[in-house]
């Protein structure tokens, strides 16, 4: 311990005075020719010879002279190495270095000038540093072994884990009930007597957990839910829980409490199942005609449930059918209105044809009998004309016509549309060709006609913007023809 204290004092002297190890308060270094001092050498040998005796040397901070080179220099009798300048010192002056890390700080001069004792000391130091490094590595390995990393899962493991989670927590809607949430299935202990007929319903196609699926046979009426299914030994297997598939070839599902329940019933795949068609208490049929009358919908409603009847959306075919029906009714209504509108026009055409054929008395009578002139002529206003009798004079009186028109059918006058004008010349008859009097001219149109003529003048008695003048009176009747009268108006006919 005294040697260590002396070495520490020398280090302080070298640090602050910058002198050699031999200059100072410490003992002077012996000359090469002189004998070693007996009082100081044995303690150094005892210190150097026992490096592994458990004594530890305090490690100096970075920037100070290492202790081991100083001790080696003291033992060899050579001057101690000068301290390194501050510029060459490590950057971290406050960090603590391990014994193994302090070895590179040794000066190469001290290594070259050291004798066998210093070599042995360096070997012991290297051994101690290697042991400390091994201990530090072992401690680091032990500390690293204490930290456990999470296992890395592959894609297959991820899928398997997700599948397990989904199996534990299946997807369901808001009001959906899972199989394990349904009430338990009642145990059926029904055995049919021998006199009751059994018919094959189908064959067990698959067994899925607690469900048994039966594929029905062809040419059989479909049975409804709650129908009791029997085995070949006439014992009841269970009731139909659900039906799916086409109507002509449905699939029936039997529900049990567990797979052990199915095994206790002795149900196996490819086994034929039966039903009792004559037992109304055990068999319920599905009437397909009634199903066709019901309106169904494949659209999902709230929470993936079936929509109520008021929220059903029917197919496009039904909408198209309704649209065609509405269009057909509209077309029929238009045709009806058009036929009612064209009836007066047809009468007017007949009047026009009869007017052109008035040269014959019979045609004249036929043309004016049972005719209705709605566009300007009315049966109520004009009486039937008799054969050979001219109309009375008061018929052509304008005052009488005005009073009759205004008091007869005022609404018809307002509703009559504007019609084109048909100017027909009055016929000229030769009195020598007709033994009878000529037919009277056609009655004039009423004063309410809506068309205008270039030379039209307002009637003096009517305050109407468009009115026709009164027709001229018929020509006076000529005297009867005579053979001796040469002053006849018409002259002889040759």
Swiss-Prot record:
Compositionally biased tracts (Basic and acidic residues): 296-305
Q: Which residues carry this modification: N-acetylmethionine?
A: 1
Q: Where in the cell is it found?
A: Cytoplasm; Nucleus
Annotated signal sequence is none
Q: List the disulfide bonds.
A: none
Citing just one GO molecular function, the answer is: telomerase RNA binding
Which keywords, in A-to-Z order, does the entry hold? Acetylation, Cytoplasm, Isopeptide bond, Nucleus, Phosphoprotein, Ribonucleoprotein, Ribosome biogenesis, RNA-binding, rRNA processing, Ubl conjugation
- One Pfam family here: Gar1
Q: Compositional bias (Acidic residues) at which positions?
A: 112-126
GO cellular component, alphabetical, reads:
cytoplasm; nucleoplasm; nucleus; sno(s)RNA-containing ribonucleoprotein complex
Protein family membership: Belongs to the NAF1 family.
Q: How does it assemble?
A: During assembly of the complex, component of the small nucleolar ribonucleoprotein particles containing H/ACA-type snoRNAs (H/ACA snoRNPs) which contains NOLA2/NHP2, NOLA3/NOP10, NAF1 and DKC1/NOLA4. Interacts directly with DKC1/NOLA4.
What is the official name of this protein in its record?
H/ACA ribonucleoprotein complex non-core subunit NAF1
- Which gene specifies this protein's sequence? NAF1
